[in-house]
Amino acid sequence: MLEHGGRLRRAARRYDLPLADWLDLSTGLAPWPWPLPEIPASAWARLPEPDDGLVEAACAYYRAHAALPVAGSQAAIQALPTLRPPARVAVLAPCYAEHAQAWRRAGHQVLEWSQAQVAADLDQLDVLVVVNPNNPTGERLSPARLLDWHRCLERRGGWLVVDEAFMDTTPGASLAPFSDLPGLIVLRSFGKFFGLAGLRLGFVLAAPALLERLDEQLGPWAVNGPSRYLAQQLLVDREAQQRQREALLQAGERLAALLEGHGLPPSGGCALFQLLRRPDASALHEHLARQAIFTRLFPDLAALRFGLPADESAWQRLDAALARYRSPL
């Protein structure tokens, strides 16, 4: 199984520090709990029904023509490769590693390409997978470029899969409004923007025929009733969404400025995280961990990702820990 952020209990054991003392900055999640409505008893007692209004709420929120709720976008990442015969698949790298692993596991030839390689050899591919904004680099490609790539793939029956897990703070850059185009598949994560990763909910936006095939592959009741109810309420609350969007954008700017102020300029990021690429990334990760501050280390990239602190005391704690850091290089 691949490594992911959020493994706080393991970090607490490794560094022998109480779990309650940790500041977890290892994930790219909104750090503030969303005010949740009361869940009716029927959501717990009855089997989930597909015509409960969740799909309509999701289509309105994402500005999409059709949507399929799934148990986190990870469920779709693992299932989509089973819907194609063996193919030549490129993943725009570096990115969230589950994509390449899922396509390899399903028997496809997987290439990890740069943008330059995609631009030069796109006509050799059956499927292209892009994480946009990129995780962990934060780089974002324009809709125009992605749609150009899609047109090239679709002419030959290919797919463009775009993982937009971190797109909610910049909805104008989303391909969701174009997701009815044949061969274009957009994945959206619910938990990151709404700060509810434990809900395990995501959406696949694509042409109805493909969604029907994916729905059949995933089976009935893929998303539980309480998750469906909560998501529907939050997806229609436009005022709360705008407050969340503004708060996240401000926090992302503050985090970038904080790192810059300590001589640690980010190499990239988005509203939900900032990435440092530097030779001493491992040493900085270790320095922070010994003070019960958990970040996400990417050894292959010599990079460290910082999520957002949840409150003022967390900001001050990170500030003080960074001030004590002395690079060994």
Protein language model features and the residues they cover:
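N-terminal "arm"/small-domain region of PLP-dependent enzymes with the aminotransferase-like
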Residues: M1-D52, A57
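Short, conserved charged micro-motifs
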Residues: L36, V118-D121, D280-H287, S313-R317
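Conserved beta-loop-alpha segment that forms the PLP phosphate-binding cup at the N-terminus of a helix
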Residues: A64-V89, G202
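Conserved PLP-anchoring active-site segment centered on the Schiff-base-forming lysine
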Residues: T82-R104, Q109-L111, A116-Q117, D121
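Active-site phosphate-binding strand-loop segment of PLP-dependent enzymes
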Residues: L111-T169
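PLP-dependent enzyme catalytic core of the Aspartate aminotransferase-like
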Residues: S142-A144, R290, P299-L329
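PLP-dependent aminotransferase class I/II
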Residues: G183-P266
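Conserved PLP-binding catalytic core of the aspartate aminotransferase-like
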Residues: L249, L259-Q291, L308
